[in-house]
């Protein structure tokens, strides 16, 4: 079930604080590391690179306009599908 509109989007307060400070720095924007996969992307995030933790490593994500409204965790997959096992039959001669 989606979040109530009257509550507004959830964004970790430390993350939004880092984003605002990064937006004020016009010379060089830093990559911001975060473990907050449940934070919603808001318009303030656009143009920043955020490294989202997937449980093992940080995956850098450049935030663009069409990502607004999605969660950060959607862009950092936690599982890697390696394929189903092949058939164990030997080929006939």
From Swiss-Prot:
Keywords: Ribonucleoprotein, Ribosomal protein, RNA-binding, rRNA-binding. GO terms for cellular component: cytoplasm; small ribosomal subunit. Pfam families: Ribosomal_S19. SUPFAM superfamilies: Ribosomal protein S19. One of its GO terms (biological process) is ribosomal small subunit assembly. GO terms for molecular function: rRNA binding; structural constituent of ribosome. It comes from the Bacteria. Belongs to the universal ribosomal protein uS19 family. HAMAP family: Ribosomal_uS19. Protein S19 forms a complex with S13 that binds strongly to the 16S ribosomal RNA. This is Small ribosomal subunit protein uS19. It comes from Karelsulcia muelleri (strain GWSS).
